[in-house]
């Protein structure tokens, strides 16, 4: 099978790139041909044999002259269609697997795939993995960045609310462009050509189903995670938070609770805009951003970890990773988080944003070592899809 993986970035940049690289490797290991289409970039590490890519678009840098065309290019890209057609004609894929494409590549690429199918008579499936809520929310988070409140006003296609709420970077102009992009493609009905939409949680699926164009085409598949070796680890007396220090992650609520629990030792591992609020608190040790073996050691030795998110998280790796390393999770009851925790076996849930409930749950776990030990042992039996198991599932979607 020939699979064309499409993503705006073709270099390591975030979770969606990790996803496409590992999926591509798995497909090749099973004998499939894989090529990639996206933006050209000096760090690009995958591609296609005709060397066809779109020009890079830098929303944070670049010349003022080049930015003048961005409002149009972010809605419709003729260049993306022309360059993609070169790849389609040469590679002749059986599957086009779309990932993040809005704004830089634009949904116009879907129209080109449809046109190519009609003109060549080829049977090529269009699969889309949703890494965020972009297709139902122009700012992709279902969260207003100005109020830091979760928001579902755009669900069902009411995208004017994006502009009303200044939901993209707090800017009326940028939010208007986001609204126009969403309204334009709603009017074109382009997303109806997607054969299957892969959602990384049942929660995300429920939100995506609000769009009638693909409500019958969604399937929930949790993200894959590398299998790790189980190790009996002596626990130390600290509670771990590892992740971004930002408002939507619930860090403000967690810090408030930490101050009210001076006898509980917390370790925070990460960076972010709220880092200054983390520093200077006696029972919080900020060890900064950690990765690899250092992060693994922190996770394994923690009595339990906390995932206090206050936005609609989809399938956070941190929640899976903690349990895979034998550390129970106290997670916020929001988004896809509850789907990943075996409540009463490998962790507990608390009401997202509720400091009092979070405090009670921390006190309960901290004061009951035997319960934490039991939860930790139960983590040995928890399983999430590896890339091999995910491959088997995705082949059923492709076929």
Name every feature range the model reports, one short phrase each:
Residues 346, 357, 364, 371-385, ...:
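A short, well-ordered alpha-helix in the C-terminal region of glycosyltransferases
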Residues 277, 320, 334-344, 348-349:
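Short acidic/histidine- and often glycine-rich active-site loop of Leloir-type glycosyltransferases
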Residues 7-13, 25-91, 272:
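N-terminal strand-loop element at the rim of the active site
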Residues 125, 135, 152-229:
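Donor nucleotide-sugar binding/catalytic pocket of nucleotide-sugar-dependent glycosyltransferases
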Residues 310, 327, 331-338, 352-353:
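Short glycine-rich donor-binding/catalytic loop of glycosyltransferases
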Residues 198, 231-249, 255-259, 267:
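Conserved donor-binding/catalytic core segment of Leloir-type glycosyltransferases
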Residues 300-314, 327:
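Acidic donor-binding loop of glycosyltransferase active sites
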Residues 276-297:
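Nucleotide-activated donor-binding/catalytic signature segment of Leloir-type glycosyltransferases, i.e.
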């Amino acid at each position: 099978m020939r699979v064309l993986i499409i993503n705006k970035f073709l270099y390591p940049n975030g979770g969606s790139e990790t996803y496409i690289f590992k999926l591509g490797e798995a497909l090749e290991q099973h004998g499939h041909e894989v090529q990639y289409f996206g933006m050209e970039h000096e760090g690009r590490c995958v591609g296609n044999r005709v060397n066809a890519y779109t020009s890079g678009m830098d929303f944070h840098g670049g010349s003022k002259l080049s930015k003048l065309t961005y409002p149009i290019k972010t809605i419709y890209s003729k260049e993306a269609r022309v360059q993609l057609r070169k790849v389609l004609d040469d590679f002749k894929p059986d599957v086009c697997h779309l990932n993040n494409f809005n704004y830089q590549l634009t949904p116009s690429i879907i129209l080109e795939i449809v046109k190519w199918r009609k003109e060549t008579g080829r049977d090529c499936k269009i699969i889309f993995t949703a890494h965020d809520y972009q297709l139902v929310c122009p700012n992709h988070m279902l969260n207003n960045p100005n109020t830091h409140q979760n928001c579902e006003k755009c669900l069902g296609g009411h995208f004017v609310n994006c502009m009303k709420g200044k939901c993209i970077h707090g800017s009326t102009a940028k939010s208007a462009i986001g609204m126009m992009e969403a309204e334009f493609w709603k009017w074109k009905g382009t997303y109806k050509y997607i054969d299957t939409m892969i959602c990384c949680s049942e929660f995300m699926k429920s939100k995506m189903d609000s769009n009638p164009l693909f409500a019958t085409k969604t399937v929930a598949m949790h993200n894959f995670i590398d299998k790790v070796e189980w190790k009996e680890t002596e626990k130390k007396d600290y509670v771990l938070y590892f992740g971004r220090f930002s408002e939507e992650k619930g860090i403000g609520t967690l810090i408030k609770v930490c101050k009210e629990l001076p006898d509980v030792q917390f370790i925070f591992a990460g960076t972010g805009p709220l880092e200054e609020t983390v520093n200077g608190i006696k029972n919080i040790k900020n060890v900064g951003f950690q990765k690899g073996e250092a992060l693994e050691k922190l996770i394994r030795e923690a009595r339990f970890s906390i995932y206090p998110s206050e936005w609609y998280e989809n399938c956070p790796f941190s929640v899976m990773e903690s349990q895979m390393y034998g550390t129970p999770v106290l997670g916020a009851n929001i988004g896809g988080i509850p789907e990943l925790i075996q409540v009463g076996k490998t962790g507990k849930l608390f009401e997202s944003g509720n400091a009092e409930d979070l405090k009670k749950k921390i006190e309960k776990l901290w004061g009951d070592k035997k319960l934490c030990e039991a939860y930790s042992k139960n983590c040995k039996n928890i399983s999430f899809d590896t890339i091999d198991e995910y491959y088997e599932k995705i082949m059923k979607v492709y076929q």
